[in-house]
């Protein structure tokens, strides 16, 4: 059978289910596909198909994630569901599954539990823009006052982590009943999807953002000048536009005199393109891998930052022993390693493999960075951790 052409007639949004173990994240994922399948918007996926999530490797870390896709009248969704709690932590910090929004599942019979809190905190730290709540297992609760109480608890918890708890849509239902074909429960799934459609904002497309390209390689072409190659991360670059080259060395200004892709000349390059940029008046030694080329003034180089970090276990190929204050590994940003010194949070003596920790880092050379940017932590070329910048300090 020929591969189906991906139709880009609806805006695309990435979502994921989060919440405490056994509160019904996977059942809800199955219910969404089964209810939408009846409307011709999805392929029904059973609980077992989703629960047997394949393992993926992202930046040297193995993560189990299930991906399903479905559509509503308005949008096309890619949906991720992780079986294990550790998979969520790894997933959210490494950005293996970018979430434009999350569906928080809370069992009405239990109310918010420790991982409910932890997942909301993670969503806050990794910058998930919006959360919609599905209160599951409402069929197991007879007392309407109890449902109201659980709803209040959820709203308070969201407020505590700076999500707008009072305005967050909370839909009550039962994923299992919906899978069994119960009409009211199926309606709750449609209500949830309507909330996801309207409440989770449409992500800004990379081409609409200011131009940025990490430099992967540099060479000189005799008689023409210096070419920097890389994949455009965001934005658009046109011939003769001015750019800045930042990070590692002092910031330099130049202009792009030619853009080349697959040995052909282009008038413009855009997000996702692998291009070579011919840079006016630069020698090969003026620019190196690890720097980034940007629209002037849009990003600054920094040395000091705070980051949310996941430390790999021995089984994941990480360290076998803990590390202590002033630990000095390499931080891999986009295309290069830079040595940095780690300061542990107050009261934390050491960090064990498998831990999730907030570190302060001081790099030996400045690197182009922004809040929410992701990096790997390496020792001698092997990945020992993954992180995301939560705050820039200089």
Curated annotation (Swiss-Prot):
One of its GO terms (molecular function) is GTPase activity. Mg(2+) binds at residue 26. Its main location: cytoplasm. Its EC number is 3.6.5.3. The keyword NADP does not apply. GTP binds at residues 19-26, 81-85, 136-139. GTP hydrolase that promotes the GTP-dependent binding of aminoacyl-tRNA to the A-site of ribosomes during protein biosynthesis. This is Elongation factor Tu. It comes from Akkermansia muciniphila (strain ATCC BAA-835 / DSM 22959 / JCM 33894 / BCRC 81048 / CCUG 64013 / CIP 107961 / Muc). The gene is tuf.
């Amino acid at each position: 059978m020929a591969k189906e052409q991906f139709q880009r007639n609806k805006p695309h949004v990435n979502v994921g289910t989060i919440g405490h173990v056994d509160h019904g994240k996977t059942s809800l994922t199955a219910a969404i596909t089964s209810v939408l399948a009846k409307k011709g918007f999805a392929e029904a996926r059973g609980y077992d198909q989703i629960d047997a999530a394949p393992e993926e490797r992202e930046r040297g870390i193995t993560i189990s994630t299930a991906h399903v896709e479905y559509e509503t009248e308005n949008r096309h969704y890619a949906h991720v569901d992780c079986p294990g709690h550790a998979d969520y932590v790894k997933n959210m910090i490494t950005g293996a599954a970018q979430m434009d929004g999350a569906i928080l599942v809370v069992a009405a019979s239990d109310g918010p539990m420790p991982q409910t809190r932890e997942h909301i905190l993670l969503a806050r730290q990794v910058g998930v823009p919006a959360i919609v709540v599905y209160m599951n297992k409402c069929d197991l609760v007879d007392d309407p006052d109890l449902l109201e109480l659980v709803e209040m608890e959820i709203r308070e918890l969201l407020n505590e982590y700076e999500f707008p708890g009072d305005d967050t849509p909370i839909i009550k239902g039962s994923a299992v009943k919906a899978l069994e074909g119960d009409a009211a429960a199926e309606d709750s799934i449609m209500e949830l999807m309507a909330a996801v459609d309207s409440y989770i904002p449409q992500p800004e497309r990379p081409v609409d953002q200011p131009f940025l390209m990490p430099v992967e390689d540099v060479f000189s072409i005799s008689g023409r000048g210096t070419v920097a190659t890389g994949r455009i991360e965001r934005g658009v670059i046109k011939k003769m536009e001015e750019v800045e080259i930042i990070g590692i060395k002092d910031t330099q200004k130049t202009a792009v005199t030619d853009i080349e892709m697959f040995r052909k000349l282009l008038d413009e390059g855009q997000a996702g393109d692998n291009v070579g940029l011919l840079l006016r008046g630069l020698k090969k030694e003026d620019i190196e891998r690890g720097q980034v080329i940007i629209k002037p003034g849009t990003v600054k180089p920094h040395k000091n930052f705070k980051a949310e970090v996941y430390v790999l276990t021995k089984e994941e190929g990480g360290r076998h022993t803990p590390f202590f204050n002033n630990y000095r590994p390499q931080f891999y940003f986009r295309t290069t390693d830079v040595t940095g010194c780690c300061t542990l949070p107050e009261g934390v003596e050491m960090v064990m493999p498998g831990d999730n920790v907030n570190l302060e880092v001081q790099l030996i050379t400045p690197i182009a960075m922004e809040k929410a940017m992701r990096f790997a932590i390496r020792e001698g070329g092997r990945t020992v951790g993954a992180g995301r910048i939560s705050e820039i300090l200089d």
